Amino acid sequence: MDEAATTPEAAASPVRANLASVAALAGVSASTASLAFSGAGPVSASTKSRVLAAAAELNYAGPDPRGQSLRRGRSGIIGVVLEESVADAFRDAMNIATLDGIADAIGASGSALLLLTDNADSPSSFRTVPLDAVVLIGCSTRLADAVHVFTQRGIPIVGVEVEPLPGVLAIDLDNREASRVLAEHLRELGHCDATMVTLPLDGAHTTGWLTREREARSEGYTASQRILGVRDVFAEAPGYVASASTVDAGYHAAFAVLAATTPTAIVAQSDVLAVGVIRAAHERGLRVPQDLSVVGFDGVRLDGVAPIDLTTMVQPAFDKGRAAGAGALALLDGVTEQPRVFASDFHRGSTTAPPR
């Protein structure tokens, strides 16, 4: 027996199928086979069926998308830049709904989403990652470096609830006006002592009482706009900055507020923060809304907190994301898009009442 014939080195390597071998088996030209896969040309149904059958027989999955990208001059990737870690971002129902909207908008184009995070190392990675367009979601006001890098690369930029910047297509939400509506609702009920529990104002997620200095240094565009909306009604309303948009963060912020002051209403900058506020109030023996009115923002479905029907502003996060995705595709096609501002709807729930 010839041992050499049985060694791995001597074993014949399987021949990898390619477009040419598929075309030969199907009895067509390589260009016709390519069109059968891409669907971009006039290929009859019978010819396409013959090509796909040959590909299946040879276990050929189709042309390398990298080659297609090179020929088109595009990567087929739309980047989405988040201001926080992916894990934290996916804890926020609004981020998920916005991403869902973006994916819905770009799906028919064949593009894929690539999630990126905005951190200290971002400008370096932004210079090399292959992208056709980029969507910035709720990123901090320190966006100039990232925008500069993407602009230098000629990559179209869409910003969802970001600080207005030249060269960035803005898809915004009426954060200031919506917060003013919430505050006005409380004032109409008779409240004059409202305190805010805000979203984080910096990348370190520093908690504590809101000061004018912290407001001036705020890196959180959405949080700052919502603060301004409340201040349009309650000019001197105090605030406490939460560490995140979570129930636990809302609980700890509200516990600190209620340990030091006795407001008749708390304006939470997200619904999940509001749930934490309500839990802290109950722990301190306060009834909502009899002793303390609480409002939120977003209009998310709050599982496991029944029978709470939160007074809040309902924002169209999916539609906002869809507009961002459509805007990115339009910019790629050289179409000039106009900025858009989405409006939130007021929902009167069971968590607000006149002060005692």
Regions from the PLM with identified roles:
Residues L131-G138, T195-V197, Y240, T261-S270, ...:
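Periplasmic-binding protein-like
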Residues M1-A5, P14, I77-V81, S85-R187:
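Alpha-helical recognition/docking segments in bacterial nutrient-uptake
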Residues E84-A97, D118-S122, I171-V181, M196-A253, ...:
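Hinge/beta->alpha junction and helix N-cap segments in small-molecule ligand-binding domains
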